[in-house]
Every structure is written in C-alpha cells, then in structure tokens.
Amino acid sequence: MRLDIIKNDKMTIINDAYNASPDSMEAALKILGRYKNRKVAILGDMFEMGEHTEYGHRLVGKSAVDNTDVIIAIGKDSKFICEEAKDLGFNENNIHHFNTKEEAIEKIDELVKKDDVVLVKASRGMELEKIVEYLNK
C-alpha cells in the first residue's frame, strides 16, 4: 500500500493508502501529475497533525490543484483540501468531499472514468484500501 501501481482494464491506480503527511501527499501528487491521462486524487485525512491540521491539509489542496484534474476528499479534515482548491480557483465541478469512504464509494463510478489515473492516499486509519479494492474489482 505504498505507491503500489495497479493497472487493470479500466484504469491505473496508485495505491498509497498506508500513511500520509503533507510531504508524502505532495510527493505522491507530483508523481500523479506526471501522467498524461486524466488524473484523479482520492485523498483522505492526515492524522496526528494537532494544531497544524488545517494548514497541512491546505498545503495538500494546493499541491492537488497543481497536479490533478479531479479532487475527491474523504474525512472531516480533508474539507480543508477542498476549501484550498476552491480558493485557488480550481473548477468546483471537479472538487468532491465526502465524510466517509462509504459515501465516496456510492458516487465513485460517476466520478472516475475509463483510462483515468487514480491516486489513493490517506493516513492508515482512514482505511482507503477499501476504495482501492472497489476500484480494482
């Protein structure tokens, strides 16, 4: 679950759902940004950020704007990723926030298209490997 590349007949998945910090999120988003196809970042909360929670998530929002076409954020704190992307002028039709991974899974087929490159990254406790399993079914 650390930068594992999964290619199936629908999409390419970059599974990095094991751990997350602002630096590792930015690094993973830069890798996503190198791809030519439409890029989707599925990003969950980063835990144990303390008083830096909002700032750290906003840094990720800026990096997402620079490296992706669609942002899907999951979790309470990931709302700051979305807010930063909106503040920077990212197309609001391509910003989606869900409170839980289950809510995201309900909508994911509408948001992810054939041949997309999809990054899945969050702190381990978010259990976003369930999203990877769903996308790879």
What are these regions (language model features)?
Residues 1-137:
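ATP-dependent carboxylate-amine ligase
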